[in-house]
Amino acid sequence: DVYKRQKYNLIANDIIIGGFSQGCMITLQTGIKRKDTVNSIVGYSGRIISTEHLSKNIVSRPNIILMHGDLDQVVPIESLLEAKEFFGKNNYEIETKIFKHCEHRIPTEGSSLGLQFIKKHFDL
């Protein structure tokens, strides 16, 4: 919120947003519609809720990594492939990772990759 951003002297580029499953969906729907671009989006096992709506409302271009398990039965792996296609058509360069033999969860490797992605975009 605005109070915390002012208290900690944060600008949008100091912020990373992310989520798992529905949290990822909300992050994707809101993250690229922000007028003040956040640094990055880290998404696990989500999908774009409405590509048509989102394509008409693109405002910013944060760094994005999306990860998904190939055995996910809650949010099928096709969701990642559709998101990758959407972002490609809209001239985004995103990173993706598909985890083999992984259902609807965040594997340890996913946590590590998310952290590496964050460090890379903050030069840590």
Predicted regions and their residues:
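Short, small-residue-biased leader/transition segments that mark boundaries at the very start
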Residues: V2-Y3
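C-terminal catalytic histidine-bearing segment of alpha/beta-hydrolase fold enzymes
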Residues: L81-L124
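Gly/Ala-rich beta-loop-alpha elbow adjacent to hydrolase catalytic centers
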Residues: G18-G23, T27
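Alpha/beta-hydrolase fold nucleophile elbow
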Residues: N9-G19
